[in-house]
Amino acid sequence: MTVFTLLPLAVACGGDIGLPAATIANTVDTLVLSALNGTPIGPPSAIDLVTGTGSRPELGDDFDFAFDIDSTGTALLYPASRLGRGGSAALQVSSVPFDSIARAPVENFVVDTIMPLTAGKVLMLRSRFSSLLCSVFVGSLPRYAKAEVLELDGVGRTVTLKLMANLNCGYRDLMPGLPDQ
């Protein structure tokens, strides 16, 4: 077995898999995304969880999830894989309030589901695998985040998200401050 095969087991059990020390504190941010369609080119339409920023898929930027509004007016969050991009970005709906989520789970993430968004919905997000800020011994790992839909603007075709992305390689803690795990 390779390290990558054993890695999910080690993470699931809370084992120390030799992650580099966390260097980036978790903070809550507000992110406004414009719909992929029917909005001016320029504002971000997608989320890059590896960097914790909005991104612009039309420019070829890396991203994990993109926002759009369909012809019926339904706001949707698309994993990159559903828009012709590779990757393993995944999500799940959380019944736990945003501020009460302390740690991302390791299971029950869905890779290819287009998620309808409504105000107040809380999501757990997992990024694509990336080696950015990971040690050479660990390889590529996902980043984890939690998000809450604060506002949907059908006229302006935007969504406002409350977002906390843990930018440290493989860490799942989702509380403010420097993460332990």
Name every feature range the model reports, one short phrase each.
Residues 1-12:
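Sec-dependent bacterial lipoprotein signal peptides
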Residues 13-181:
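Surface-exposed, beta-sheet-biased, low-hydrophobicity segments with strongly acidic/polar composition
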